[in-house]
């Protein structure tokens, strides 16, 4: 639609607004009591014959947005849409009277109306409502996008999500499914004895992950604060305090790039369980995700893009070093210097930064050469100690940690470990991170004295888990971009 056409439409719609007022009707309506939603009408009455509907004279009241409209004269049809779908209405001047029929005639696509009437089927067998009362509820002053040309622009769908929800039933379905996924997640955890808690979103120290924070300032306290990059360290304090199984589903903020997999604010599930380790958390993770898929989708076998993914437990478990050996043919089990690791990286075309040591290079091999090949659910465990400052070292090979990440369709979906509960070791790890920061790693962890003090009171052996909720929703709704599963994703200025 050209700018000129839009301006014409806006003018015409404002003129119609005046006409509605001249008829003594409030163009922005009032409360309307519905008996049914569109989908319920099909469920209840869709199988009845024309004759049965005629005989039963079923009275209903529905409300929604006009999506199609045809026929004028003394009778017309329209489809109105509510959250569940569309139902056809049939409006006849003889049934509703002159004033209400005039209202119907001047109604535009996008206007919101309420109707009362009886159920019937048209000649072609379409379930419809024969309207006896037509009530105007909201005048739309802007036209909806044209059905077949209007909302193909993906950027407009993200910027004006309300139009996307009106015009694209698939989009609405995705967001309803998202809500069901989070409800199912909560139900599972609540029924397994986990306590849902809420912890601060503004932190004095940015910790719990390798990421750049958003920085803000508290005027009254005159102090710098960081929007949380993880929920982890506050939940661990609660484990110290004796709350043995805790979780939080909440927003996390990372001041980083935007991509099909990354948005600066996103939703995480973080969970901690005292007296558990990372292997217990593996079992919990596969059972939780399989439960959600079964409850929400009715199956653990799902389509994602070109892949058929089987979420049925038990999932594959593979050490990071073995994964590199399997997919690249390089063996990092043998002892080697940082320099030898660097040479291997050069040989295999793996890019490494100046501050990187043996463990970082192992991780780079995995991320650059293996990660995107892991289509079926796979737990990759045994991450190097250098990239896991909050995880317990593996007792058999202290170069690695008791940590895992879950990969499905080549993407990380969860991160978990046997938590580091030794405050002396934790302090040393933080000190190593500070050295990395000095060498140019701006994602290295800061020193957190308050957290160290909490650990010194004694935290029991603990297993912890973080699941990216948005990525899980992408997987379970077959959505290619994170922006397809966020109602209002972050966008650049127009």
Curated annotation (Swiss-Prot):
Keywords: Aminoacyl-tRNA synthetase, ATP-binding, Cytoplasm, Ligase, Magnesium, Metal-binding, Nucleotide-binding, Protein biosynthesis. The gene is lysS. One of its GO terms (cellular component) is cytosol. Its cofactor is Mg(2+). Its EC number is 6.1.1.6. This is Lysine--tRNA ligase. It comes from Geobacillus stearothermophilus (Bacillus stearothermophilus). Its main location: cytoplasm. SUPFAM superfamilies: Class II aaRS and biotin synthetases (SSF55681), Nucleic acid-binding proteins (SSF50249). InterPro entries: Aa-tRNA-synt_II (IPR004364), aa-tRNA-synth_II (IPR006195), aa-tRNA-synth_II/BPL/LPL (IPR045864), Lys-tRNA-ligase_II (IPR002313), Lys-tRNA-ligase_II_bac/euk (IPR034762), Lys-tRNA-ligase_II_N (IPR044136), Lys-tRNA-synth_II_C (IPR018149), NA-bd_OB-fold (IPR012340). GO terms for molecular function: ATP binding; catalytic activity, acting on a protein; lysine-tRNA ligase activity; magnesium ion binding; transferase activity; tRNA binding. Homodimer.
């Amino acid at each position: 639609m050209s700018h000129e056409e839009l301006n014409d439409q806006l003018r015409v719609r404002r003129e119609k607004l005046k006409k509605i007022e001249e008829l003594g009707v409030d163009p922005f309506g009032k409360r309307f009591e519905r008996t049914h939603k569109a989908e319920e009408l099909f469920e209840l009455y869709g199988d009845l014959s024309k004759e049965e509907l005629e005989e039963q004279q079923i009275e209903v009241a529905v409300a929604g947005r006009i999506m199609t409209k045809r026929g004028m004269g003394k009778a017309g049809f329209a489809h109105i849409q509510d959250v569940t779908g569309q139902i056809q209405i049939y409006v006849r001047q003889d049934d509703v009277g002159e004033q209400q029929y005039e209202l119907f005639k001047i109604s535009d696509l996008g206007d919101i109306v309420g109707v009362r009437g009886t159920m019937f089927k048209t000649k072609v067998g379409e379930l419809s409502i024969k309207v006896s009362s037509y009530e105007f509820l909201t005048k739309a002053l802007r036209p909806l996008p044209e059905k077949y040309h209007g909302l193909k622009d993906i950027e407009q769908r993200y910027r004006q999500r309300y139009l996307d929800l009106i015009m694209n039933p698939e989009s609405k379905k995705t967001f309803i499914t998202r809500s069901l996924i989070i409800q199912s997640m909560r139900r599972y955890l609540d029924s397994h004895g986990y306590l849902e808690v809420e912890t601060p979103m503004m932190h004095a120290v940015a910790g719990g992950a390798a990421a750049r924070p958003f920085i803000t300032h508290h005027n009254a306290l005159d102090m710098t604060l960081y929007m949380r990059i993880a929920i982890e360290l506050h939940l661990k304090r609660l484990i110290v305090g004796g709350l043995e199984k805790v979780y939080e589903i909440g927003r996390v903020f990372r001041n980083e790039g935007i991509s099909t997999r990354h948005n600066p604010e996103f939703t995480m599930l973080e969970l901690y369980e005292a007296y558990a380790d990372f292997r217990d958390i593996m079992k919990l993770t596969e059972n939780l995700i399989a439960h959600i898929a079964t409850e929400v989708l009715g199956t653990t076998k799902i389509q994602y893009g070109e892949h058929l993914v089987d979420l049925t437990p038990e999932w594959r478990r593979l050490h990071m070093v073995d994964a590199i050996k399997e997919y690249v043919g390089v063996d990092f089990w043998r002892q080697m210097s940082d320099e030898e690791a660097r040479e291997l990286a050069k040989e295999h075309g793996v890019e490494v930064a100046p501050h990187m040591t043996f463990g970082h290079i192992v991780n780079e091999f995995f991320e650059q050469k293996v990660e995107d090949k892991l289509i079926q659910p796979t737990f990759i465990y045994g991450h190097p100690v250098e990239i896991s400052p909050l995880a317990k070292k593996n007792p058999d090979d202290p170069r690695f940690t008791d940590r895992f990440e879950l990969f499905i369709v080549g993407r990380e979906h969860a991160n978990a470990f046997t938590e580091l509960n030794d405050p002396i070791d934790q302090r040393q790890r933080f000190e190593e991170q500070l050295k990395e920061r000095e060498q140019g790693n701006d994602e290295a962890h800061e020193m957190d004295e308050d957290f160290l003090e909490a650990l010194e009171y004694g935290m029991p052996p603990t297993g912890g888990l973080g699941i990216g909720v948005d990525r899980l929703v992408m997987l379970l709704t077959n959505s290619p971009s994170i922006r397809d599963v966020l109602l209002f994703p972050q966008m650049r200025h127009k």
